């Protein structure tokens, strides 16, 4: 009987004697030494289900059979075995995505092969399923520390770190001095430098009465003072926005502006300042409209789903039925899914889009199940109200509208079933012909366009003055072509209309030429409507009595009206045109375009005729299958829809936020779902042209859970899907969520996370250096109110945080990356901190909070493909002197100055910023126009606040470095200022390493 062993079980298994190696190595060698290596490092990619390179290492037979490259194991010949080739070298190919085997592990495998590669035939290796981040979360016991270090234990954090250091033969560095701690806390918690007065006040308070160290009570008071500052939310919101890819433009080719993205940014700032519980913060960003109806933050938080890049061309200009359109929408949902799981759970679920995850236990079914959670939402401007009563009413009406939309979809499905194959074939024929009716070339001057109306039964007219009476032979109407709302050919052509002629502009005693007011006239597409007459007239009027539908409104539009005389000459061209009303939007729409001799003509006139015929057949069939009961039901639903729209229209206009939305104004091919989820299928190799089974809304499998699927009723709404996901993520027993956020907060205080890959807690990521500390922090945060401020307080009051950043030669030789935290990490200020600090010390910083972002560029061609011209911007503009978190962030053309200083790239998630040191940074800090303008402002401030040059220098050092100047600085800076001027000295002072680095 064969046995199957996991790594945990086979270590203790007893293997059959005689099947193992002989005395050297002994019979337990494979079981105890080699099998754990193969199971822990290799079997995940080389197993029966997923044999990477054609090689499985689960059994002796499969391992010795080899793979695509030949014999991976040549018995007795390690140097001829491909297996070892992949495991050795400076950069071993295997294990892929994981740390290489140690020299000792490679040696053990080599010994095993050399000794005969014996493997018990009844021993099967399985994937080790005990990855650290997947394990249930519980509070570890706080370790004890040696008596010599007990005085340094201020918080449980210290005990965990000191115990780990002691294991390595190291210890904490001495505590930092008061000035260093004040500056460190101000920047970490607010992102701004302390003023000279703040530095002096708090340094004095922090200094113990006997000058023996730091006054702990005063230190805690400073921490609480900074956490209560509104500047705190601005600082910590910036970290969050880095991760979620926030920007004020869409990215991709056209990089359109998002005028209403900023309310989400302000929501994040406000949430941090309010110390909102983390579970609530998460739930608002995924399903706030469903879980907290009527509350503005429930809408504002949904800006998270819309924060990332968006393909304008792929959604607006390309139909959803085209491959590029399908790809755009698939990738858009991919971004929503990956951003959600990367941010909140540190899971790289996007790796399962084209195939099952290579390293983590997630399948394509899980991935596309998550896509289906977001299948009804798009990124768009949506209305919200600060008045909770109005917001609740609006959300109630939107929910009603979604319900009606669902019933209309069901009605359409009923009609489709009743029409059978004939209806389906006609619709397919019409869809195929529609693309052939595009105009031969786009005409920018479309024609005449009436004002927009909320209902169809409104009269609109347009008339032509021929200047004098003329005997007529024919009147020809040419339809428009416009892709707005996906309409295309026949845009705005009236459903019911008439043509009249008269001798006077008042149309007294008018004569009727054509009357199409008794029935609905089919859309002529790009065909013409011709009316013959032998009457004489000076004025010709076309009157629409039933307007053409757009999206939730109605219009009357014509591209051209030709009027032919008896000699077949168009006498209307260039005539005077008047109308009941007109939108007059040159060059696109205006009255004069109606008689300019230009109109769209189809590439395939025969296709137009076929399409008109097919539509007539479709209309006839629909009249047959739409029974009186069905007609009555449709009209009731349409009336209900109109009532809801009218009630929504009567509500206050509200404010706008760019967020996840199911209701918004259509733009070209970009249309709202109305709350009805799109069909999402598992895609073979991620190919939109190869759909497989329909995806079922789900989460991800976790240990101890029987299923990842949500328990949703059959009549659930799209918001129910998002609510289920939000609840799953914030469940108390979720092992990933609480570890993820604790790791992020730790990282921003120490400039390095406990788990080195904050967005990836899977097997491709790095395990934590202090796993028990991470678990303790996660449980403490989760169980003590989920308060960010409490977690900050716990971390920054620890001795680990309060130690100096001074170098220790011996410890650095042992732990050069400081992963065991034997000192505080020194870091360069982030780009926003540098810019804000320069504004602060120069006296130019405007602390106004919230509102639309300010430009650091000149904006050109905003309506098509915006150009963001940074070199044309004047940095002396006071509107740009606010904190950097409020700047307008562009994806495709980021600010060169901020990018040089390693600012986050908003086109991708930035869980940890790079810190580089380049010549370009030095050049920018010295010569960028912003630096020059601020140096002048800094000099003016010094001259206004200090009289003598020595006092100005000392004041400048206090402002930039938070200390008094020394004798050498006063002497050398005075000499420099006398030779080159105070402004040039200020340029130098703003480039000091001590100014831009934090100890």
Q: Model regions: which residues?
A:
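Aromatic, loop-rich ligand-recognition surfaces of beta-strand-rich domains
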Residues: 443-509, 523-624, 643, 719-723
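Extended surface/linker regions that mediate inter-domain or inter-protein docking
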Residues: 215-364, 370-371, 647, 786
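Short, surface-exposed tryptophan/glycine-enriched loops
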Residues: 268-272, 341, 525-539, 780-782
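Active-site histidine-acidic residue metal-binding/catalytic motifs
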Residues: 95, 252, 274, 308-446, ...
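Short, solvent-exposed loop/turn and secondary-structure capping segments
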Residues: 47-50, 54-57, 95-97, 106, ...
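Bacterial N-terminal signal peptides
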Residues: 8-19
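Solvent-exposed helix-loop boundary motif
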Residues: 22-110, 114, 118-163, 179-184, ...
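Primarily short, surface-exposed interaction patches in extracytoplasmic proteins
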Residues: 149-184, 188-231, 246-293, 404-406, ...
């Amino acid at each position: 009987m064969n046995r199957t062993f996991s790594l945990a079980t086979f270590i203790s298994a007893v293997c059959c004697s005689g099947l193992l190696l002989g005395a050297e190595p002994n019979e337990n060698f494979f079981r105890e030494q080699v099998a754990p290596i193969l199971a822990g490092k290799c079997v995940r990619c080389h197993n029966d289900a997923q044999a990477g390179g054609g090689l499985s290492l689960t059994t002796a037979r499969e391992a010795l059979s080899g793979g695509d490259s030949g014999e991976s194991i040549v018995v007795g010949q390690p140097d001829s075995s491909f297996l070892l080739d992949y495991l050795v070298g400076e950069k071993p190919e295997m294990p892929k995505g994981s740390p290489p085997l140690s020299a000792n592990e490679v040696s053990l495998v080599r010994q095993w092969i050399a000794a005969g590669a014996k493997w018990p035939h009844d021993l099967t290796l399985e994937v080790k399923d005990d990855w650290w981040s997947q394990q249930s979360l519980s509070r570890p016991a706080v370790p004890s520390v040696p008596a010599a270090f007990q005085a340094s234990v201020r918080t449980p954090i210290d005990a965990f770190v000191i115990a780990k250091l002691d294991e390595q033969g190291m210890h904490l560095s001495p505590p930092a001095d008061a000035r260093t701690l004040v500056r460190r806390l101000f920047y970490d918690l607010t992102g701004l430098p302390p003023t000279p007065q703040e530095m002096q006040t708090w340094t004095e308070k922090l200094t113990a009465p006997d000058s023996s160290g730091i006054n702990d009570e005063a230190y805690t008071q400073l921490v609480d003072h900074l956490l209560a500052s509104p500047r705190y939310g601005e600082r910590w919101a910036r970290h969050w926005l880095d991760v979620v890819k926030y920007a004020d433009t869409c990215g991709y080719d056209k990089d359109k502006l998002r005028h209403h993205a900023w309310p989400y940014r302000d929501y994040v700032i406000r949430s941090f300042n309010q110390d909102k519980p983390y579970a609530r913060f998460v739930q608002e960003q995924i399903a706030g409209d469903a879980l907290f109806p009527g509350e503005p933050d429930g809408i504002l938080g949904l800006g998270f789903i819309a924060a990332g890049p968006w393909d304008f061309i792929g959604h607006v200009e390309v139909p959803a039925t085209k491959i590029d359109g399908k790809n755009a929408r698939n990738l858009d949902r991919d971004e929503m899914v990956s951003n959600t799981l990367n941010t909140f759970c540190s899971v790289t679920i996007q790796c399962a889009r084209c195939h099952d995850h290579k390293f983590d236990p997630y399948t394509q079914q899980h991935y596309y199940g998550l896509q289906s959670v977001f299948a009804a939402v798009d990124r768009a401007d949506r209305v919200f109200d600060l008045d909770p009563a109005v917001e609740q009413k609006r959300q109630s009406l939107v929910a009603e509208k979604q319900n009606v939309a669902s019933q209309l979809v069901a009605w359409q499905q009923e009609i489709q079933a009743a029409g059978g194959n004939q209806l389906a074939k006609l619709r397919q024929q019409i869809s195929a012909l529609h693309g052939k009716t595009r105009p031969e070339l786009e005409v920018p001057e479309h024609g005449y366009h009436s004002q927009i109306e909320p209902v169809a039964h409104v009269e609109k007219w347009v008339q032509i003055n021929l200047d004098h009476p003329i005997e007529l032979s024919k009147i020809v109407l040419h339809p428009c072509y416009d892709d707005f709302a996906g309409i295309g050919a026949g845009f705005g052509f009236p459903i019911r209309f008439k043509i009249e002629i008269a001798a006077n502009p008042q149309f007294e005693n008018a004569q009727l030429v054509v009357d199409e007011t008794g029935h609905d006239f089919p859309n002529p597409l790009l065909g013409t409507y011709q009316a013959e007459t032998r009457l004489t007239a000076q004025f010709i009027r076309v009157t629409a009595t039933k307007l053409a539908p757009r999206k939730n409104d109605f219009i009357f539009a014509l591209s051209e009206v030709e009027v032919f005389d008896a000699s077949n000459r168009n006498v209307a061209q260039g005539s005077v045109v008047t109308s009941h009303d007109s939108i007059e939007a040159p060059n696109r729409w205006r009255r004069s375009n109606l008689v300019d001799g230009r109109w769209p003509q189809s590439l395939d006139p025969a296709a137009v005729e076929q399409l008109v015929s097919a539509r007539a057949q479709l209309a006839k069939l629909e009249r047959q299958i739409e029974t009186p009961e069905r007609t009555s039901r449709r009209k009731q639903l349409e009336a209900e829809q109109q009532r809801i729209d009218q009630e929504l229209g009567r509500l206050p206009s509200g404010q706008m936020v760019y967020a996840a939305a199911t209701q918004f104004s259509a733009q070209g091919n970009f249309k709202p779902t109305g709350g009805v989820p799109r069909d999402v299928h598992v895609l073979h190799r991620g190919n939109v042209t190869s759909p497989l089974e329909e995806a079922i809304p789900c989460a991800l499998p976790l240990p101890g859970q029987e299923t990842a699927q949500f328990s949703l009723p059959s009549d659930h709404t799209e918001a129910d899907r998002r609510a289920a996901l939000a609840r799953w993520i914030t469940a108390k027993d979720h092992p990933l969520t609480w570890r993820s956020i604790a790791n992020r907060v730790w990282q921003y205080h120490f400039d390095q996370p406990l788990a080195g890959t904050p967005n990836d807690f899977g097997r491709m990521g790095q395990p934590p250096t202090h796993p028990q500390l991470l678990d303790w922090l996660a449980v403490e945060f989760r169980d003590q109110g989920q308060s960010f401020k409490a977690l900050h307080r716990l971390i920054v009051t620890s001795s680990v945080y309060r130690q100096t950043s001074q170098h220790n030669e011996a410890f650095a030789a042992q732990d050069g990356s400081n992963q065991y935290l034997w000192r505080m990490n020194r870091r360069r200020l982030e780009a926003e901190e540098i810019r804000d600090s320069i504004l602060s010390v120069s006296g130019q910083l405007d602390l106004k909070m919230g509102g639309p972002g300010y430009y650091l560029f000149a904006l050109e061609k905003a309506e098509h493909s915006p150009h963001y011209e940074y070199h044309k911007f004047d940095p002396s503009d006071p509107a740009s002197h606010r904190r950097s978190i409020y700047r307008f962030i562009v994806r495709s053309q980021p600010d060169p100055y901020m990018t040089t200083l390693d600012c986050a790239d908003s086109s991708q998630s930035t869980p940890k910023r790079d810190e580089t040191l380049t010549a370009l940074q030095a050049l920018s800090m010295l010569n960028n126009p912003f630096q020059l303008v601020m140096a002048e402002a800094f000099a003016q401030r010094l001259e206004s606040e200090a009289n003598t040059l020595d006092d100005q220098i000392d004041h400048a050092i206090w402002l930039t470095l938070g200390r008094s100047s020394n004798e050498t600085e006063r002497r050398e800076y005075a000499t420099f200022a006398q030779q080159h001027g105070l402004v040039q000295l200020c340029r130098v002072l703003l480039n000091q390493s001590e100014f831009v680095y934090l100890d």
